[in-house]
Swiss-Prot record:
Superkingdom of origin organism: Eukaryota
Full protein name: Solute carrier family 26 member 6
Recorded topology in the membrane: Multi-pass membrane protein
Modes of activity regulation: Oxalate transport activity is inhibited by 4,4'-diisothiocyanatostilbene-2,2'-disulfonic acid (DIDS).
Annotated glycan sites: N167, N172
Phosphoserine PTM positions: S616, S752, S755
Organism: Homo sapiens
UniProt gene name: SLC26A6
Tissue: Ubiquitous. Highest levels in kidney and pancreas. Lower expression in heart, skeletal muscle, liver and placenta. Also found in lung and brain.
Outcome when changing N167Q: Reduced chloride oxalate exchanger activity
UniProt GO BP: angiotensin-activated signaling pathway; bicarbonate transport; cellular response to cAMP; cellular response to fructose stimulus; cellular response to type II interferon; chloride transmembrane transport; chloride transport; epithelial fluid transport
Major location category of this protein: membrane
Length: 759
């Protein structure tokens, strides 16, 4: 009984669901309205141009309220900090800030090495920019600071402008490091200027040109670049400096060539550190629900490796390279070297765009997850100020880290108070504890970097998913990845963006063209090739393109239209013109002979003359022109015969029609262009539409348009598209309106057709 009772409600529910589905299918709606062309629609809806909003007037207003609003807009901390719920959020932000700081310390040291700078400058870059973002940022969860992709981009610039000496024994490390710090800090200032400038002019949409496949392909290639750049620290090798295209290939070849020179102590140190880091990360993933915060594997590895290196003397006994001197305290601000701007402007713009793209993509992910809004333009300003002010204090360009951002969110972080706490912890290390890491092996920092690349290297699996989902996106991913690997990071991004934009143009050149048919008993029209029940309306051809028509695809649109209609329009027009020309020539010849006949009839002799008027009878028969009769003309009755012949010609049907000329006629009398996909029209599109009207009217097919949006109609008017031959009565509110009108008004053969000039 219990089982039966339990199954009863389920059966009842299933029956109700089926009944509701049937009711929904049977539920239809009936609506009666007149056919609406554009003229009637404008009258009915009282259409008028939308009023222009003068946003610039608002921007240029000068008032106390406007100044206060601008202050709150560009300094968001004044908005959210007074409302900060201390009891609910402070504990989570404190724990999150400490967790992020524990990650910031080893990553800052390691990523400075990746940028070709002394490790302490990674700590500076983990303090100043983070605190500046706390004041100006709008994302509550991203962790700003050093990041592998940004660091390797900076490293490629510093190594190209301040390279190693050709003879390693002649290296002046102090002078080299000072030059690289100057290059990196100047680069950071220039990156900040670009980002602030773009943010102030509301240019945050620039990141929309970097699609997700492009960004993921780029970061994956950058991860490969980072991995290769750390091999010299893992194996303890001294490599030559390579920059420019194919530098990655040259570096890999040199590593393979010098692999026998590897230092065993360095390799063992890196391997042990890597194994420890991997094990700790696996434990964190497995015990994520049980642990209040992740095990700080990087910090523990850092402390343990430093202690072992100091106790065992790894530098002297096994020639393991160590970090060396880390000065305590902060450095004074330094003005950027403006003479380097011309050399850095290209790299600075690339780094600015990439850094912003990474930050805004992560920021939007967390904002969507937690239900708040991120202002892309203010994010540009915040990142720009972080890099600008950070560069003055000798930091290198930063962005946000995915791994640290995830930790900041997962450990209870609710606001950028967590970022401020982490920056204060880094400040404590800079001032008091930095010198304790003097004996930290560089191989350990390299291991930390390589292990943290796991997430980005996993993006190689994108190729499989993109192959199944969208092969055009896969092509973007592959081109971006390959170009970045071969041409380096700056040129790789340029090639990727250009290719992505070209692919967009190519895809608009080859949209999906379809002939539409009516779904039975509805006013819905679908592609007859996809919907088996959709049938073409007899006598009417409905054509649609899935993309807007503009200069790049207007010719393709016209060609596809003529092909899908099943009529060789150009051939019919050319044959019609040839036959009409021949007909005119025959008529002219006949008139000339009649004139000659009249002259002979008016001669004084008055003799009866037998004349064959039509000497080209066979020619006229072969061209389907009405046969001319052989006639006997005398001087007495010639004018009466000519009058009779003229009356017969006036009653004859129009000889210019396809039927009269013996040419095949289209099996439809009306063509409807579904223009619902058009978002704009240019002059080339206007000319193409005009030519379509002209060509199809030449073969006795009337053309109508349907489903144009109001902005498109306005652009048609501005382009003087409508005239005496093409009016708004040819434009209908929907495809069904146009089809119904075409069926009610099949185009008759006109006595004097309205001509449309072909453009």
């Amino acid at each position: 009984m219990g089982l039966a009772d339990a199954s009863g409600p389920r059966d009842t529910q299933a029956l109700l669901s089926a009944t509701q589905a049937m009711d929904l299918r049977r539920r239809d709606y009936h609506m009666e309205r007149p056919l609406l062309n554009q003229e009637h629609l404008e009258e009915l809806g009282r259409w008028g141009s939308a009023p222009r909003t003068h946003q610039w007037r608002t921007w240029l207003q000068c008032s106390r309220a406007r100044a206060y609003a601008l202050l709150l807009q560009h300094l968001p901390v004044l908005v959210w900090l007074p409302r900060y719920p201390v009891r609910d959020w402070l504990l989570g932000d404190l724990l999150s800030g400490l967790s992020v700081a524990i990650m910031q310390l080893p990553q800052g040291l390691a990523y400075a090495l990746l940028a070709g700078l002394p490790p302490v400058f990674g700590l500076y870059s983990s303090f100043y920019p983070v605190f500046i973002y706390f004041l100006f940022g709008t994302s509550r969860h991203i962790s700003v600071g050093t990041f592998a992709v940004m660091s390797v981009m900076v490293g490629s610039v510093t190594e190209s402008l301040a390279p190693q000496a050709l003879n390693d024994s002649m290296i002046n490390e102090t002078a080299r490091d000072a030059a690289r710090v100057q290059v990196a800090s100047t680069l950071s200032v220039l990156v900040g200027l670009f980002q602030v400038g773009l943010g102030l002019i509301h240019f945050g949409f620039v990141v929309t040109y970097l699609s997700e496949p492009l960004v993921r392909g780029y970061t994956t290639a950058a991860a490969v670049q980072v991995f290769v750049s750390q091999l010299k620290y893992v194996f303890g090798l001294h490599l030559s400096s390579h920059s420019g295209p194919l530098s990655l290939i040259y570096t890999v070849l040199e590593v393979c060539w010098k692999l026998p020179q590897s230092k065993v102590g360095t390799v063992v140190t890196a391997a042990v550190a890597g194994v420890v880091l991997v094990v700790v990360k696996l434990l964190n993933d497995k015990l994520q629900q049980q642990l209040p915060m992740p095990i700080p594997g990087e910090l523990l590895t850092l402390i343990g490796a430093t202690g072992i290196s100091y106790g065992m003397g790894l530098k002297h006994r096994f020639e393991v390279d160590v970090v060396g001197n880390i000065p305590a305290g902060l450095v004074p601000p330094v003005a950027p070297n403006t003479q380097l701007f011309s050399k850095l402007v290209g790299s600075a713009f690339t780094i600015a765009v990439v850094g912003f793209a990474i930050a805004i993509s992560l920021g939007k992910i967390f904002a969507l997850r937690h239900g708040y809004r991120v202002d892309s333009n203010q994010e540009l300003v915040a990142l720009g100020l972080s890099n600008l002010i950070g560069g003055i204090f000798q930091c290198f360009p930063v962005s946000c880290s995915m791994s640290r951002s995830l930790v900041q969110e997962s450990t209870g972080g609710n606001s950028q108070v967590a970022g401020a706490i982490s920056s204060l912890f880094i400040l404590l290390i800079i001032v008091k504890l930095g010198e304790l890491f003097h004996d930290l092996p560089k191989a350990v920092l390299a291991a930390i970097i390589i292990v943290n690349l796991k997430g980005m290297l996993r993006q190689l699996s994108d190729m499989r998913s993109l192959w199944k989902a969208n092969r055009a996106d896969l092509l973007i991913w592959l081109v971006t990845f390959t170009a970045t690997i071969l041409l380096n990071l700056d040129l790789g991004l340029v090639v990727a963006v250009i290719f992505s934009l070209l692919l967009v143009v190519v895809r608009t050149q080859m949209p999906h063209y379809s002939v539409l048919g009516q779904v039975p008993d509805t006013d819905i029209y679908r592609d007859v090739a996809e919907y088996s029940e959709a049938k073409e309306v007899r006598g009417v051809k409905v054509f649609r393109s899935s993309a807007t028509v503009y200069f790049a695809n207007a010719e393709f649109y016209s060609d596809a239209l003529k092909q899908r209609c099943g009529v060789d329009v150009d051939f019919l027009i050319s044959q019609k013109k040839k036959l009409l020309k021949k007909q005119e020539q025959l008529k002219l010849k006949q008139l000339q002979k009649e004139e000659k006949l009249r002259k002979q009839a008016a001669s004084p002799k008055g003799a009866s003359v037998s004349i064959n008027v039509n000497t080209s009878l066979e020619d006229m028969r072969s061209n389907n022109v009405e046969d001319c009769k052989m006639m006997q003309v005398s001087s007495g009755d010639k004018m009466e015969d000519a009058t009779a012949n003229g009356q017969e010609d006036s009653k004859a049907p129009d000889g210019s029609t396809l039927k009269a000329l013996g040419l095949p006629q289209p099996d439809f009398h009306s063509l409807i262009l579904d223009l619902g996909a058009l978002s704009f029209v240019d002059t080339v599109c206007l000319k193409s539409l005009k030519n379509i009207f002209h060509d199809f009217r030449e073969i006795e097919v009337e053309v109508y348009m349907a489903a144009c949006h109001s902005p498109v109609v306005s652009q048609l008017e501005a382009g003087h598209f409508f005239d005496a031959s093409i009016t708004k009565k040819h434009l209908f509110a929907s495809v069904h309106d146009a089809v119904t009108f075409a069926l009610q008004h099949p185009r008759p053969v006109p006595d004097s057709p309205v001509s449309v000039t072909r453009l």
